[in-house]
Swiss-Prot record:
This is GTP 3',8-cyclase. Keywords: 4Fe-4S, GTP-binding, Iron, Iron-sulfur, Lyase, Metal-binding, Molybdenum cofactor biosynthesis, Nucleotide-binding, S-adenosyl-L-methionine. It catalyses: GTP + AH2 + S-adenosyl-L-methionine = (8S)-3',8-cyclo-7,8-dihydroguanosine 5'-triphosphate + 5'-deoxyadenosine + L-methionine + A + H(+). Its EC number is 4.1.99.22. It comes from Escherichia coli O139:H28 (strain E24377A / ETEC). It comes from the Bacteria. The gene is moaA. The keyword Transcription does not apply.
């Protein structure tokens, strides 16, 4: 289906990132170093399964092909499997993925796959168990590794792993990561540390450009692959000697926003046109009944006309994003 979601800069949007909670049980240094603190949840709480069904149906009608369930930690929701199944009901949604810290993967991933999940991203910022504990505040490294193995055993052909690139923390561990993916079909995605409202000091201390890794990968014979229209923002590299791939997400690179293809809805039903944008468009009042779908689609389409050409991270403007758990990164 051709996307009806096209902005003023001719960008087409096939990809919805849907946050279903902002609660997380990890305390990652770059996201929630002091742990989760409730904020911004209305009296209605987080989106219900029925509301999720309605909002994804509207986006699918407008051309969305891929939905990623994010958080917080999505698997903290007891109805998470039901949420996957609700999104899966719509045949227009070809891909349903989750971004998770992985602590419930080993237990639940087979059920998620049976419900309709097609893709998994797991956050792993270090392959050293002690450093993993220091970064996340949780001694769960072995549990997360077992969860990744369980995903393969459940039938997932590829698992994506997200690694936030941090100077003097993990930027010098490329060889360790490459050894890990040599015989595993893992797409390891290094994500540049992004400045958020609460993370300015950490950013100044640990930010390093992904260009450093890209230059090294090219020097070693890795090959840049072409993007598909519903792919995320990663530049993906492959190598004939490796079963795995490397992805680089570099939001500070020139023209990063030119290929933007994704919109975000928060766990309380606000449409966000950019991770680092201002405000948000309330959709929740149009999620109460199936008869509101036409009005919901109209509001989404109208909001898209206001999407800016680029973020303003280079001007140190992080918008409303105080931390990355707020609207799902």
């Amino acid at each position: 289906m051709a996307s009806q979601l096209t902005d003023a800069f001719a960008r087409k949007f096939y990809y919805l990132r849907l946050s279903i909670t902002d609660v997380c049980n990890f305390r990652c240094t770059y996201c929630l170093p002091d742990g989760y603190k409730p904020s911004g949840v209305t009296n209605k709480g987080f989106l219900t399964v029925d509301e999720i069904r309605r909002v994804t149906r509207a986006f699918a009608s407008l051309g969305t092909e891929k939905v990623r369930l994010t958080g917080g930690e999505p698997s903290l929701r007891r109805d998470f499997t039901d949420i996957i199944a609700a999104v899966r009901e719509n045949d227009a949604i070809r891909q349903i993925a989750v971004t998770t810290n992985g602590y419930r993967l080993e237990r639940d991933v087979a059920n998620w796959r049976d419900a309709g999940l097609t893709g998994i991203n797991v956050s792993v910022d270090s392959l050293d168990a002690r450093q993993f504990h220091a970064i996340t505040g949780q001694d769960k490294f072995n549990q997360v590794m077992a969860g990744i193995d369980a995903a393969f055993e459940a039938g997932f052909e590829k698992v994506k792993v997200n690694t936030v690139l941090m100077r003097d923390v993990n930027h010098h561990q490329l060889d360790t990561f490459l050894n890990w993916i040599q015989h595993r079909p893992i797409q390891l995605r290094f994500i540049e540390l992004m400045e958020t409202g609460e993370g300015s000091e950490l950013f100044r201390k640990h930010h390093i450009s992904g260009q450093v890794l890209r230059d090294e990968l090219l020097r070693r014979g890795w090959i840049h692959q072409l993007r598909q229209r519903s792919d995320g923002p990663a530049q993906v590299f492959c190598h004939p000697d490796y079963a795995g791939e490397i992805g680089l997400i570099m939001p500070y690179e020139k023209d990063f926003c030119a290929t933007c293809n994704r919109l975000r809805v928060s766990s309380i039903g606000k449409l966000h046109l950019c991770l680092f944008g201002e405000g948000g468009v309330n959709l929740r009042d149009l999620l109460e009944d199936d008869t509101q779908q036409q009005a919901l689609e109209a509001r989404i389409s109208a909001a898209l006309r206001e999407k800016k050409q680029t973020h303003f991270l280079h001007q140190n403007n992080t918008g409303i994003t105080q931390n990355l758990s707020y609207i799902g990164g």
